[in-house]
């Protein structure tokens, strides 16, 4: 089992999905000086407790890559203080839970994926496009690595704002995982989203196939019903759903 906890995002930080970017916000790697602030934000916005080992790994770059959002327009003593962050880790493609969904050469053991662990923005800086920019930093970084085949993450099933954001960023929803999260003794489903890069995209994921079949059958039923209701109609209109992402 991974020594890092299952990944969470802050639901409310996803409210900025369609907002214009703020020019005073800059993005940089997280460093040891961010430790206290990083711990504080995680405590404030996430429903689970993260161990000290996790934060030490983040700020020291041990098995984790990370980005901080800072507001350079703030007074000097706060201009480099975290207002948002994203943390992620490398996972070997052959050892990942999506190895059946990506194209990669199994003989090349160095081929990897990037898994997003945590993402959050402090309340006073939401609705400014910061969450979107942080995810974009991860995608840009991953796309520049020839051995990387994708970026993936989990999102709790009721977090509609986050789901919309990932779709907008061209992530694909490939699976629904029942009871994935355990929060306050209650289980919650999660969706698995993947951003395919460097030619790793499979022709169609199992979930997309299932969604297509369901939509096809629904369309067929609707068309038959329409024909029976109007015998003068010439030909059936088969309605296909072009968007097979999870909803």
From Swiss-Prot:
Superkingdom to which the source organism belongs: Eukaryota
Keywords: Acyltransferase, Chromatin regulator, Chromosome partition, Meiosis, Transferase
Domain N-acetyltransferase: 25-198
Short name of one Pfam family: Acetyltransf_1
GO MF, one example: protein-N-terminal amino-acid acetyltransferase activity
Catalytic activity, as annotated: L-lysyl-[protein] + acetyl-CoA = N(6)-acetyl-L-lysyl-[protein] + CoA + H(+)
InterPro entries: Acyl_CoA_acyltransferase, GNAT_dom, NAA60-like
Enzyme Commission identifier(s): 2.3.1.48
Biological processes annotated in GO: chromosome segregation; meiotic cell cycle
Note: The gain-of-function mutant mcc1 (T-DNA tagging) has elongated rosette leaves, increased stem length elongation, early flowering and reduced fertility and seed number due to defects in meiosis.
Similarity-based family: Belongs to the acetyltransferase family.
Function field: Histone acetyltransferase that probably regulates acetylation status of histone H3 during meiosis. Histone acetylation may influence recombination and chromosome segregation.
Protein name in the entry: Histone acetyltransferase MCC1
Organism: Arabidopsis thaliana (Mouse-ear cress)
Gene: MCC1
């Amino acid at each position: 089992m991974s020594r890092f906890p299952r990944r969470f995002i802050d639901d409310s930080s996803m409210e900025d999905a369609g907002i214009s970017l703020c020019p005073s916000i800059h993005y940089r790697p997280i460093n040891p000086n961010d430790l206290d602030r990083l711990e504080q934000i995680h405590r404030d916005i996430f429903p689970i407790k993260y161990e000290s080992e996790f934060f030490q790994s983040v700020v020291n770059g041990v098995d984790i890559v990370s980005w901080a959002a800072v507001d350079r327009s703030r007074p000097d003593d706060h201009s480099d203080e975290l207002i948002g962050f994203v943390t992620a880790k490398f996972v070997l493609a052959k050892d990942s839970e999506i190895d059946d969904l990506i194209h990669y050469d199994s003989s090349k053991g160095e081929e990897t994926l990037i898994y997003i662990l945590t993402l959050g923005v402090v309340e006073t800086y939401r609705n400014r496009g910061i969450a979107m920019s942080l995810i974009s930093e991860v995608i840009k970084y991953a796309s520049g690595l020839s051995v990387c085949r994708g970026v993936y993450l989990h999102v709790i099933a009721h977090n509609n704002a986050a789901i919309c954001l990932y779709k907008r960023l061209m992530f694909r929803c490939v699976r629904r995982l029942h009871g994935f999260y355990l929060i306050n003794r209650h289980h919650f489903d999660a969706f698995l989203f993947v951003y395919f890069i460097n030619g790793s995209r499979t022709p169609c994921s199992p979930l997309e196939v299932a969604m297509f079949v369901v939509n096809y059958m629904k369309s067929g039923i609707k068309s038959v019903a329409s024909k029976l209701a109007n015998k003068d109609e010439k030909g059936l209109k088969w309605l296909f759903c072009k968007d097979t992402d999870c909803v």
